[in-house]
Structure formats: C-alpha cells, structure tokens
C-alpha cells in the first residue's frame, strides 16, 4: 500500500456543492440564490453595517474615548517578572530581550506584585512604586540613579 492508494471510506465524506450543475443537484439554475434581487447578482453583497437605508447603529451612537499615545510606549512590570531577566542588571533593553515588555516600550515602572527571588540592580530610566522599591532593596538589590 502506498500513500496514493489511500482514499476515504465510501460515504464518509460529503461531496462539495457545485451550484449551477443541473436540477437534480438541488442547486441548479439559480444556484441557491433565489430569483432576482441584489444578492442574486454577482458582486451583490451588502456592506457590513448597512441596515437598508436606516441610520446604522455605529452612526446612531455617540463617539467616546480615545487611544492614549502614552499607553503605547509605557509598561508596568511585576516584581515576579524580574526573574525572567538574565543577569543582575535590569534595564529597558534586558526586559525587551526577555520578552517581558513590547519592543515599542520606552518607559517602565515596576509594581509590587509577586516576590523578588534574587538581588538585582535596576538601571536608569526604570521607575518603581514605593513598595516595589523597598522589596527590591530588602532582597539586596539597588537602584542606579
């Protein structure tokens, strides 16, 4: 037996629909599209959100909110995530290399969540909450100013 000899068991798979191939197929002539009208024509699809001429929902509701540009280049890091960084010095670049933060992030702040397992030196440009700072210093770590 070879791979080209293999075929599914008879009746285990349904035949694909072939519209417009005779009355007996059940999809002949109009091909399941019905008679006349926009959707019976080729290219006759209705745009997403179109509601037949009435004011669409996305235009009936008011605009709100915005996307903060600050949120795109800032990130919060938990104490427990510092363990993923190889080496003793934690910088923005080492956090990126360890896939802790996104490559677009420029400013980082460490939050008190989890535990510090080893002494680490936090590089310049990385902020920390009071609780996170005291936890890092209690574990023997320090901050570069």
From Swiss-Prot:
Gene Ontology cellular component list: cytosolic large ribosomal subunit
SUPFAM superfamilies, per database record: Ribosomal proteins L15p and L18e (SSF52080)
Region (Disordered): 1-57
Keyword annotations from UniProtKB, A to Z: Ribonucleoprotein, Ribosomal protein, RNA-binding, rRNA-binding
Pfam families on file: Ribosomal_L27A (PF00828)
Extent of Gly residues compositional bias: 21-31
InterPro entries in alphabetical order: Ribosomal_uL15 (IPR030878), Ribosomal_uL15/eL18 (IPR021131), Ribosomal_uL15/eL18_sf (IPR036227), Ribosomal_uL15_bac-type (IPR005749)
GO process annotations (BP): translation
Claim: Transferase is one of the keywords in the record: no
Sample GO molecular function, one term: structural constituent of ribosome
Range of residues in the leader sequence: none
Subunit structure: Part of the 50S ribosomal subunit.
Job description of the protein: Binds to the 23S rRNA.
Family, similarity comment: Belongs to the universal ribosomal protein uL15 family.
Protein name: Large ribosomal subunit protein uL15
Protein's organism: Pseudomonas fluorescens (strain SBW25)
UniProt gene name: rplO
């Amino acid at each position: 037996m070879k791979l080209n000899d293999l075929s599914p068991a008879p009746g285990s798979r349904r035949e694909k629909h072939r519209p417009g191939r005779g009355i007996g197929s059940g999809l002949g002539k109009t091909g399941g599209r019905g008679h006349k009208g926009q959707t019976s024509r080729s290219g006759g699809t209705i745009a997403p959100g179109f509601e037949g001429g009435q004011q669409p929902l996305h235009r009936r509701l008011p605009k709100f909110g915005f996307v903060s540009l600050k949120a795109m280049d800032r990130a919060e890091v938990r104490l427990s995530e510092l363990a993923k960084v190889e080496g003793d010095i934690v910088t923005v670049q080492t956090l990126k290399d360890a896939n802790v933060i996104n490559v677009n992030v420029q400013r980082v702040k460490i939050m008190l969540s989890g535990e510090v397992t080893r002494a680490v030196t936090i590089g310049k440009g990385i902020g920390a909450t009071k609780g996170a700072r005291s936890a890092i210093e209690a574990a023997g770590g320090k901050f570069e100013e």
